[in-house]
Design a protein with these regions (language model features):
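A composition-biased, non-transmembrane "mature-region" signal
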Residues: 1-173
């Protein structure tokens, strides 16, 4: 699992050739999923959490608690927008054990997509089918998470959609 921290489009022929023919380049950080909520919050339920470095999403029963370093914010499920989709990803690092390889390409490609024979060490890279979960709202939240099994992103998205259909609690003074 990874959190995408930056991405950019491949625009020039040189970029296309040196990025294995990819159309977009990502900077990603390793992430993990757990059932541990924030340390300072005591709950009587397990809190599903996605963590990556100093960022975390804690899925509480009525809202999402977002941690960025020492700062916290909350977003009701009703304000969240999300998409889940399978994506083809050129993997230049170690292939996850549960990853599904669907194709392969070369580290350095020519314009037609074949191997660029000018490079002595031009390794073949696997193309995997990953799941992309995008979570955003109208107030600035925009996070893209990649998971090594495409169907997991869809399951998480369905669970979040179901959580958003539950009306928020009414707090009486």
């Amino acid at each position: 699992m990874w959190l995408i921290t930056a991405s950019g489009a491949v625009r020039t022929t040189y970029q296309y050739k040196t990025h294995a023919g990819a159309s977009t380049v990502h900077n990603r950080v390793a992430a993990s999923a757990s059932m541990n909520g924030p340390r300072r919050l005591v709950t009587n339920v397990a809190v599903p959490t996605l963590t990556s470095g100093h960022r975390a999403l804690h899925f509480l029963p009525d809202r999402v608690l977002i941690r960025e370093g020492k700062n916290f914010a909350e977003v009701p499920y009703q304000r969240l927008e999300l998409t889940a989709e399978p994506v083809r990803y050129i993997e230049s690092e170690a292939v996850p054990r549960d990853g599904q390889i669907v194709d392969s390409t070369w580290q350095y490609v020519n314009v037609t997509g074949g191997p660029d024979r000018r490079y002595k060490y031009n390794r073949q890279l696997p193309i995997l089918l990953y799941g992309r979960l995008t979570i955003w709202d109208d107030h600035g939240l925009h996070m893209i998470w990649y998971v090594s099994r495409a169907e997991l992103a869809e399951k998480v998205a369905k669970a979040l959609v179901n959580a958003s259909s539950v009306p928020p609690p009414i707090i009486q003074p």
